[in-house]
């Protein structure tokens, strides 16, 4: 059964509601049958070589936190079959979209987790990831909720621990305040370097970027996206 209350959470409450529209029968079946085969088992200590997590042989491992409907993650894992991907999404309807996509086009280089991403970060070995993507995270607009934003000193410490030197942390948002917040936090953190040289480095989408449903909605409503890339020193 799907636990919509989802009692397991890590140190921070970084996401809001977990469930939207009721799932269709096929989607519920995918949660019962497909997700257990792809979900990381955090009760088992992580291997020092994360490549062993995947059915396909991979050279490096990347992580996407809060993949929404999975448009980018499914696209990227197909585009780079030599890389392993860990995707985390606590929102049940987003995970349902990803499972439906994987049911049609499987990715042997992809593993999933449907709870708090900080639990995965704390489970991973040191210097084990080649990249972390955080695209359009919940901005938590109200000041009293800013502490829930995923970009924080504590989570940047987590990123710094699990990222290899030279690895990328990529962040995209259409919320100017959150963009500035992320720039301030990353630029004052000793482990990260922002190497932008011109406005194109943050105004232009990432190479090969497929776009997302959320981004398309933001563009229709007149908002623009900013794409930041930080390098692990």
From Swiss-Prot:
Belongs to the class I-like SAM-binding methyltransferase superfamily. TrmB family. It is an enzyme of class 2 (transferase). The active site is at 138. S-adenosyl-L-methionine binds at residues 64, 89, 116, 138. One of its GO terms (molecular function) is tRNA (guanine(46)-N7)-methyltransferase activity. Substrate binds at residues 142, 174, 212-215. It comes from Brucella suis biovar 1 (strain 1330). Its EC number is 2.1.1.33. Residues 1-22 are annotated as: Disordered. Coiled coil: none annotated. This is tRNA (guanine-N(7)-)-methyltransferase. The gene is trmB. It comes from the Bacteria. Pathway: tRNA modification; N(7)-methylguanine-tRNA biosynthesis. PANTHER family: 3-DEOXY-D-MANNO-OCTULOSONIC-ACID TRANSFERASE/TRNA GUANINE-N 7 - -METHYLTRANSFERASE, PENTACOTRIPEPTIDE-REPEAT REGION OF PRORP DOMAIN-CONTAINING PROTEIN. One of its GO terms (cellular component) is tRNA methyltransferase complex. Keywords: Methyltransferase, S-adenosyl-L-methionine, Transferase, tRNA processing. It catalyses: guanosine(46) in tRNA + S-adenosyl-L-methionine = N(7)-methylguanosine(46) in tRNA + S-adenosyl-L-homocysteine. Catalyzes the formation of N(7)-methylguanine at position 46 (m7G46) in tRNA. Pfam families: Methyltransf_4 (PF02390).
